């Protein structure tokens, strides 16, 4: 039971905070102080857990009817601890940076909702068997829907959200099918080989569960909520899926899986990187940030690079958490953002260095090129959004600005805490080429933007002519990734299915509607009693 302490603490603290803040009407400052202290305590507990790695919890007779022998196993491994630590660290940073967003939204709902989301995210990361993973994913969906309903002022959830949860449900069903086909009683890490069908179902299920499709639109116009609760909301599901993939042994013997998923994932990642870099602001580009890293992770997984997945996850949370939680621009936050970028590029002996470790030893030259270009573009986009000017908020008190800065600093320090237990792996992952090119690319892009060259290029007829087909392709991709085609198809199917009903209703509403009703009633009654004669 010791392994469940962080989860139980988060649940207990969320209930206490909701009670004292909602029913006792405690001041917002005092409520925040209790919240910050609570999540920091859980964060410290998780660090202690990495030092001792307590034994997991195994539930054998979980079904009172005895109709299933599948185990429920919850534990932390060396890899899954990193994902749990990233998630809880993101929660701590969210709470600390929320000091500059006091009174700009329902802070109580934001904080307790973020704690609940983190709790169910930890529950999923802890899951060590397929059945436990399936249950945890279902719980995540239920909690997210409940929080969205409480936050969104409209009476109905946007259709994009409905399709998003529908795709997640389909992903869960695919993993259920994999569980039925595999009939494996071992933990996920204990299974070294899956059949082709089971492996394919697991990859497809994880892809749909990533939660990046369809590309979401904001469900609320409240920017503070989008920065705090929205950030946790968009990271919980992907982190839980990445943790799941880090436990499933890649099956390199299925070459056709690699040949299909690797190019598709890389092209998707490249598209997401370009859209992220050209987005108007970081919140508009957030779905593309998630899409790009999801594609890179999937491509790395099918090639068998688990350490690369861990490094990509650190970059996704480190860079994404920093840029999405940063509410205003200051000299300090800009410098810290550049430090964050240097940490992300994967210099040797840094926590993110495995992001380049598999190059050029594996994969085709074209795949390695697309992978590298995608990372370069992501880093350039990150620098662009860091340097993009925002209105600096000087109206906040000094202590609010202090904790806000501490929250951003924490995000930069998180990877260095993980390296304490990963240095033996990090020191063997040395690649200078990728990081150096990344730094040069970011520097050149900054210098070019500072000149008149971009404006001259954008205004040139040759550029406009070249961008015409690119704009058409981009429009097609946007419609595909936002699932506009699905909405159109669904509407047409719905219209087709409702035609007989509309015809039937039109008949009944006519002048002879009563006679038709009696006739149909007589026919139905005769069928039920079996008295039809011919």
Regions found by a protein language model. Give the residues of each.
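C-terminal ends of transmembrane helices
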Residues: 14-25, 91-104, 145-160, 210-224, ...
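Aromatic-capped, Gly/Pro-kinked transmembrane alpha-helices
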Residues: 426-430, 454-534
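Alpha-helical multi-pass transmembrane bundles of energy-transducing inner-membrane proteins
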Residues: 20-28, 112-197, 208, 276-337, ...
């Amino acid at each position: 039971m010791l392994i469940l302490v962080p989860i139980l603490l988060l649940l207990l603290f969320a209930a206490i905070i909701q009670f004292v803040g909602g029913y006792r009407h405690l001041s917002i400052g005092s409520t925040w102080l209790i919240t910050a202290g609570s999540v920091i305590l859980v964060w410290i507990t998780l660090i202690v857990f990495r030092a001792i790695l307590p034994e997991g919890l195994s539930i054998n007779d979980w079904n009172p009817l005895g109709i299933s022998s599948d185990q429920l196993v919850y534990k932390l491994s060396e890899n899954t601890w990193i994902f749990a630590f990233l998630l809880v660290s993101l929660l701590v940073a969210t709470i600390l940076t929320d000091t500059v967003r006091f009174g700009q939204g329902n802070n109580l709902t934001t904080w307790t909702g973020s704690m609940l989301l983190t709790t169910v995210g930890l529950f999923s990361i802890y899951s060590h068997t397929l059945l436990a993973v399936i249950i945890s994913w279902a719980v995540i969906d239920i909690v997210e829907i409940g929080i969205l309903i409480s936050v969104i002022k409209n009476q109905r959830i946007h259709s994009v959200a409905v399709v998003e949860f529908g795709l997640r449900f389909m992903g869960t069903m695919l993993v259920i099918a994999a569980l039925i086909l595999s009939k494996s009683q071992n933990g996920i890490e204990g299974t070294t080989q899956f059949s082709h069908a089971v492996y394919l179902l697991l990859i497809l299920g994880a892809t749909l569960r990533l939660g990046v499709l369809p590309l979401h639109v904001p469900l609320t116009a409240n920017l503070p909520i989008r920065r705090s609760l929205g950030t946790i909301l968009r990271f919980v599901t992907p982190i839980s899926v990445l943790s799941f993939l880090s436990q499933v042994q890649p099956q390199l013997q299925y070459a056709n899986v690699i040949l299909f998923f690797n190019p598709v994932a890389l092209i998707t990642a490249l598209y997401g990187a370009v859209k992220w870099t050209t987005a108007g602001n970081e919140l508009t580009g957030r779905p593309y940030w998630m899409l790009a890293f999801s594609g890179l992770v999937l491509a790395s997984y099918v090639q068998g690079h688990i350490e690369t997945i861990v490094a990509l996850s650190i970059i996704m949370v480190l860079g994404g958490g920093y840029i999405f939680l940063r509410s205003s621009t200051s000299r300090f936050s800009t410098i810290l953002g550049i430090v964050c970028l240097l940490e992300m590029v994967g210099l040797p002996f840094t926590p993110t260095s495995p992001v380049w470790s598999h190059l050029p030893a594996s994969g085709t030259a074209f795949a390695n090129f697309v992978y590298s270009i995608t990372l370069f573009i992501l880093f350039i986009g990150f620098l662009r959004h860091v340097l993009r000017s925002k209105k600096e908020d000087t109206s906040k008190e000094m202590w609010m600005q202090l904790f806000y800065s501490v929250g951003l600093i924490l995000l930069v320090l998180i990877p260095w805490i993980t390296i304490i237990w990963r240095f033996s792996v990090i020191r063997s992952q040395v690649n200078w080429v990728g990081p150096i090119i990344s730094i040069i690319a970011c520097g050149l892009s900054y210098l070019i933007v500072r000149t008149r060259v971009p404006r001259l290029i954008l205004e040139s007829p040759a550029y406009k002519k070249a961008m015409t087909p690119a704009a058409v392709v981009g429009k097609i991709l946007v419609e595909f990734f936002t699932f506009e085609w699905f909405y159109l198809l669904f509407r047409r199917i719905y219209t087709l299915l409702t035609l007989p009903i509309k015809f039937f209703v039109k008949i009944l509403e006519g002048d002879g509607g009563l006679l038709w009703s009696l006739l149909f009633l007589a026919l139905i009654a005769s069928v039920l009693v079996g008295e039809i004669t011919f």
